[in-house]
């Protein structure tokens, strides 16, 4: 479908949880494991088993764990729920420990709210770590994405906005959206 990275939910409580990488996995796509409050050993074991390239951490993981996983050879993406400018400031302790930050919509539980947060808050982000924009992105989000600008914005994370049911992605909608997004003058 044209995605550069493909995420696999490694959080047992999620309806999107996967035990292993599908056999039809495109070879060029980076494999991203999504974890919530897992310990280092569990993450490393799953990363080895699934052949992961990147680790996305969506819980209350410490900067120390992010640093350890980076030192273990993985690109780490640390997610932050953004509601206020103070939420953006929480990234400070993680500077230098992650390849990317991911800014998402706060919701009960972890992930998949289908709602956007106020992207204007990200004008408060002055860090050096590039970030991914997430939370409520769907096919109708293209005009808002075209209007968004930030010097550290590196990409987007898509999930529930492209599902026909939990864990069932609409491949045609994803492909169309990704093609259009890649052609935006960002």
Predicted feature locations:
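Conserved N-terminal beta1-alpha1 strand-loop-helix module at the mouth
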Residues: 1-186
